[in-house]
From Swiss-Prot:
Stated role: Required for maturation of urease via the functional incorporation of the urease nickel metallocenter.
Matches recorded under HAMAP family: UreD (MF_01384)
Name listed for the protein in its UniProt record: Urease accessory protein UreD
Pfam families per UniProt: UreD
Organism: Agrobacterium fabrum (strain C58 / ATCC 33970)
Keyword list, A-Z: Chaperone, Cytoplasm, Nickel insertion
Main subcellular location: cytoplasm
GO MF annotation terms: nickel cation binding
Length: 284
């Protein structure tokens, strides 16, 4: 009996020494729109885990979807996937309830994937608020879009390397951003961004961010790309640059802090949206 108790005790001690598996956030969300009597209406809605989607009332023909990560932020090992489809002849604006915060990762890398599609004559505007990367955050982000030849697409992705107003900075960590955009079945835009290791040292280089800690990439695919180019360049000034070719307009801007970046983004987004403002949640 004594030897049996000792064996049980030893087994329990061994189990107690095993590391506890940390809980990770998982989420999947999908929205699809359809045209009903000239207005964009909900066709499909799916949400699972920490991924939530809310649909505020609008007073226009476009539908608006607000993406919510109910876990409150991301850390190593978290995984969220969003899918948004604008059906034929519809207009869909997708944004987020707040800035996505990516916290220090004790292990693993957070993953966020967005899969976008737009049907014939559709407009899809992907306008999430900024992603804030805290020190030692680790994030792998991917944006994929499959667009009909006659559709219009706007994508904005803004990043803050810490919050300057709070005295925070991302000095070390990992941020990988991958875009794959297909238009009419053809790959028209592909890019890879990688900030890894000594992030502050890397972004201080003149050829990278020259010490700026807020930056954004904007992509417009549509019939007005050439006409918009000089207007976008006038807004961006020395804080960014823009290029246009074959119906695609790419804009990159950077700033010293998040507030200064927003002062650039608001008029640029409005111009790309033919005068329509940014979603209201951006102003809250």
């Amino acid at each position: 009996m004594q030897s049996e108790q000792q064996a049980i005790g030893a087994s329990g001690c061994e189990d107690a020494q095993q590391p506890v598996r940390q809980q990770r956030a998982r989420g999947r969300g999908r929205i699809v729109t359809k045209a009903v009597e000239g207005r964009s209406r909900l066709d499909e809605l799916f949400q699972e885990g920490c991924a939530k989607i809310r649909l505020p009332d609008t007073f226009s023909n476009e539908a608006e979807a607000i993406l919510i990560n109910s876990s409150g932020g991301l850390t190593g090992g978290d995984d969220i996937e969003w899918q948004a489809t604008a059906g034929a002849g519809t207009s869909l604006v997708v944004t987020t309830q707040a800035c996505e915060k990516v916290y220090k990762a004790s292990s693993g890398t957070a993953t966020v994937t967005a899969r976008i599609s737009a049907g014939p004559g559709a407009k899809l505007h992907w306008l999430p608020q900024e992603t804030i990367l805290f020190d030692r955050a680790s994030l792998n982000r991917r944006l994929e879009a499959d667009l009909d030849q006659s559709s219009e697409f706007i994508a904005v992705e803004a990043v803050l390397l810490g919050r300057q107003a709070m005295g925070e900075a991302m000095t070390h960590g990992l941020f990988r951003d991958r875009w794959r955009i297909r238009h009419g079945g053809r790959l028209v835009h592909a890019e890879e961004l990688l900030l890894e290791g000594e992030v502050a040292e890397l972004t201080a280089k003149p050829a990278v961010l020259a010490g700026q800690v807020a930056f954004a990439t904007l992509l417009y695919i549509g019939p007005l790309s050439e006409a918009l180019l000089p207007k976008i360049r006038a807004i961006a000034g020395e804080s960014g640059g823009a290029s246009e070719w074959q119906g695609k307009l790419v804009v990159r801007v950077s700033a010293a802090d998040g507030f200064s970046l927003r002062k650039l983004l608001f008029p640029i987004i409005s111009l790309l949206r033919n005068g329509a403002p940014v979603p209201k949640v951006w102003n809250l």
